[in-house]
């Protein structure tokens, strides 16, 4: 029997689901328990294929627009995704007489309120974010067309010409890189000294915490694996942060079977984290895949303990959600005990 080579896996904490993602998934599951299938969900509830497929198996039906819901099912509940939606979406739901449950992350809702506050004070709103991201579409859709300008890059910030440079306020997409945001803000604040910040930090606590955990584990890592989907903004940022802070290579994977072990080369230290929409059960799966090939020692790299939780919608608070209901995403193994 061959002897397995030793391997240290640095397991980042915090990692994976944030309170907003956890709440959104719970809302879909609770709606299924209370109202029965099907429950419609506008857009992916979170950007993770495994989560979406798991909810589909339990009776959720995902649509991109409300008019995709058949008329005979318009008495069934519809859930809005964690990313938030433009104001036009609940207005359309009201026109269709749909019963909807809003799973928008409370921190995204806070950004919406900050944008509206800027407008009430007569300011044009600058949104720092990525075009086409559902959260950006939702935030821009809180105000009338033309009231928000999207700034994606430092180049955008350098060339932006407002109508009134003394009447500007900004908000940011919650899942942006802290460093990327800082560079854009530095340009904007130098060009427009009167630029008004939001009353509270727009970048989500979980985004910052996961980036800090990756920074702490990156140096000395032969490989840094980030569990997440290609369309997950916060997961892609973690890959960038890992490389920027010293990992020899950093890879985004959705499942263990995407890892090409034959091409990884010699490994002594592998660091492992997960984006805010990536389930813990995939972290378990990846560790198991490494255990089949290496003599693995787990080292927990913890930077902060997260205690945040968000209440689900009032209509669902009388429904009991069991650990078994969430087992398809949370997993059952030893890594779960290491996650805060």
UniProtKB/Swiss-Prot annotation:
Family annotation (InterPro entries): LytB/IspH
EC number: 1.17.7.4
Cofactor(s) the protein needs: [4Fe-4S] cluster
Positions that bind [4Fe-4S] cluster: 18, 105, 204
Binding site for dimethylallyl diphosphate: 47, 83, 133, 232-234, 277
Keyword field contains 4Fe-4S: yes
Binding site for (2E)-4-hydroxy-3-methylbut-2-enyl diphosphate: 47, 83, 133, 174, 232-234, 277
Gene Ontology terms for molecular function: 4 iron, 4 sulfur cluster binding; 4-hydroxy-3-methylbut-2-enyl diphosphate reductase activity; metal ion binding
GO BP terms: dimethylallyl diphosphate biosynthetic process; isopentenyl diphosphate biosynthetic process, methylerythritol 4-phosphate pathway; terpenoid biosynthetic process
Pathway recorded for this protein: Isoprenoid biosynthesis; dimethylallyl diphosphate biosynthesis; dimethylallyl diphosphate from (2E)-4-hydroxy-3-methylbutenyl diphosphate: step 1/1; Isoprenoid biosynthesis; isopentenyl diphosphate biosynthesis via DXP pathway; isopentenyl diphosphate from 1-deoxy-D-xylulose 5-phosphate: step 6/6
Alphabetic keyword roster: 4Fe-4S, Iron, Iron-sulfur, Isoprene biosynthesis, Metal-binding, Oxidoreductase
UniProt-recorded name of the protein: 4-hydroxy-3-methylbut-2-enyl diphosphate reductase
Gene source species: Bartonella quintana (strain Toulouse) (Rochalimaea quintana)
């Amino acid at each position: 029997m061959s002897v397995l080579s030793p391997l240290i896996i640095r397991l980042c904490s915090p990692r994976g689901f944030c309170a907003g993602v956890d709440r959104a998934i719970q809302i879909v599951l609770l709606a299924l328990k209370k109202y029965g299938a099907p429950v419609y969900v506008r857009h992916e509830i979170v950007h993770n294929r495994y989560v979406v497929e798991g909810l589909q198996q339990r009776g959720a039906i995902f649509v991109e627009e409300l008019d995709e819901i058949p008329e005979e099912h318009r008495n069934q509940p519809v859930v809005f995704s964690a990313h938030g939606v433009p104001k036009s979406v609940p207005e359309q739901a009201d026109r269709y007489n749909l019963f909807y449950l809003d799973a928008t992350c409370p921190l995204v809702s806070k950004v919406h309120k900050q944008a509206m506050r800027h407008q009430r004070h007569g300011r044009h709103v600058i949104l720092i974010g990525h075009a086409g991201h559902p959260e950006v579409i939702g935030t821009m859709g809180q105000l009338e067309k033309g009231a928000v300008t999207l700034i994606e890059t430092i180049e955008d910030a350098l060339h932006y010409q407002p109508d009134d440079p003394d009447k500007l306020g900004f908000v940011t997409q919650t899942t942006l890189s802290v460093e990327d945001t800082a560079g854009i803000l530095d340009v904007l604040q130098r060009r427009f000294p009167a630029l008004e910040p939001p009353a509270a930090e727009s970048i989500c606590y979980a985004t910052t915490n996961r980036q800090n955990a990756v920074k702490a584990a990156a140096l000395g890592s032969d490989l840094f694996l980030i569990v997440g989907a290609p369309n997950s903004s916060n997961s892609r940022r973690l890959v960038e942060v890992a490389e920027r802070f010293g990992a020899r290579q950093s890879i985004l994977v959705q499942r263990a079977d995407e890892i090409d072990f034959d091409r990884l080369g010699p490994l002594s230290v592998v660091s492992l984290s997960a984006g805010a929409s990536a389930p813990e059960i995939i972290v378990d799966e990846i560790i198991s895949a490494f255990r089949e090939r290496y003599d693995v020692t787990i080292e927990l790299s913890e930077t902060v303990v997260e205690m945040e939780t968000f209440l689900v919608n009032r209509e669902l608070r009388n429904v009991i959600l069991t650990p078994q209901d969430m087992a398809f995403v949370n997993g059952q193994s030893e890594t779960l005990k290491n996650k805060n």
